[in-house]
């Protein structure tokens, strides 16, 4: 049983972000099932609402089934929002990433210094809108759990991607929209988080990968399958 957050989350346009998250979960389930010798398949239950889609999952024993190659990475893969090495992708790495989303999707790579700089500039500008938007403030306040490394249902502070000093300042400022607006207007409050969360990681990496559907996604199931493809690339 799924649900979406469009009623309170600015980023969940028409619930499609949540639908993609459902796809990521279903693909993780499918991969994990192979470790138990099971084939997992799913179908969107007809008539279930877009805001609360229901997925029927079927598990079938398959003796001799080989574990999915992505199985070991379910528990080890983590979000990394800090600067990384700029070592270019090898042909094998690029080929693996290109094949990961499966049929119906194309991977586009932005690898050169100029391309990464362009992406960084785009993220720098879009982050400004994100950080000054009053409608986004309640979302940011809700989803971060401060002073922790792990969280059951939110983004833990150590996964946000800022240094300790910036984290303490952000925690205090984000206690009220009035503080956020004052800092953004008069004290350059967007600069430090944009540098640390957007610009530097965008420049200091091997590549950016854009996953494009060969056919524009329409409806819940198409976005769920987009989440399946994205999860395979991420793992």
Regions found by a protein language model. Give the residues of each.
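Acidic, surface-exposed loops and disordered segments
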Residues: 1-235
């Amino acid at each position: 049983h799924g649900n979406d957050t469009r009623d309170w989350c600015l980023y969940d346009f028409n619930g499609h972000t949540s639908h993609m998250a459902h796809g990521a979960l279903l693909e993780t389930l499918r991969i994990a099932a192979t470790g138990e010798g099971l084939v997992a398949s799913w179908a969107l239950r007809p008539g279930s609402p877009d805001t609360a889609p229901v997925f029927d999952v079927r598990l079938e024993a398959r003796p001799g089934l080989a574990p999915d190659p992505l199985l070991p990475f379910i528990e080890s893969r983590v979000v990394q929002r800090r600067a990384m090495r700029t070592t270019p992708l090898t042909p094998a790495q690029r080929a693996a990433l290109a094949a990961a989303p499966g049929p119906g999707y194309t991977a586009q790579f932005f690898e050169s210094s100029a391309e990464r700089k362009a992406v960084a500039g785009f993220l720098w500008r879009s982050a400004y809108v994100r950080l000054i938007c009053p409608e986004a403030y309640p979302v940011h306040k809700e989803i971060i759990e401060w002073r922790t490394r792990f969280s059951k249902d939110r983004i833990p502070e150590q996964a946000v991607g800022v240094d300790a000093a910036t984290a303490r300042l952000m925690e205090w400022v984000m206690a009220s929209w009035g503080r956020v607006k004052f800092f953004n207007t008069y004290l350059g409050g967007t600069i430090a988080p944009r540098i640390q969360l957007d610009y530097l990681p965008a420049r200091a990496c091997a590549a950016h990968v854009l996953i494009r559907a060969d056919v524009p996604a329409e409806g819940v199931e198409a976005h769920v399958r987009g989440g399946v493809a994205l999860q395979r690339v991420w793992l």
